[in-house]
């Protein structure tokens, strides 16, 4: 998961390519990190579970937070690619940490 404006999609692909074949990816199906992870996972034959946000969730911050909690609940390990400013990515990382999940965060610059 991660920021839509993460400037280094190749880092996402490199991470996915390092995963074992039995791994799976859960994604919110957004542009940016989600799209890069999905593309790399499908190219490698890694299972992808898509949990897209509904229109209501995109329009309502409270509903968006609930959807991000569902992503946290569904994962064993949260891997985030953060642009350093996205509040949604930061909040989801905090939710995962509060839930006792293993969390890995890769920080990059926002895309210009």
Language model segments and positions:
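Acidic/glycine-enriched connector segments
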Residues: 2-111
């Amino acid at each position: 998961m991660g920021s839509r404006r993460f400037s280094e999609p190749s880092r996402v692909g490199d991470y996915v390519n390092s995963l074992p074949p039995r791994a799976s990816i859960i994604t919110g199906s957004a542009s940016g990190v989600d799209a890069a992870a999905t593309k790399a996972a499908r190219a490698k034959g890694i299972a992808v579970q898509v949990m897209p946000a509904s229109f209501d969730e995109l329009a309502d911050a409270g509903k968006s937070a609930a959807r991000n909690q569902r992503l946290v609940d569904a994962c064993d390990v949260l891997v985030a690619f953060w642009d350093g400013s996205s509040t949604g990515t930061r909040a989801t990382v905090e939710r995962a940490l509060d839930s006792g999940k293993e969390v890995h965060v890769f920080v990059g610059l926002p895309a210009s």
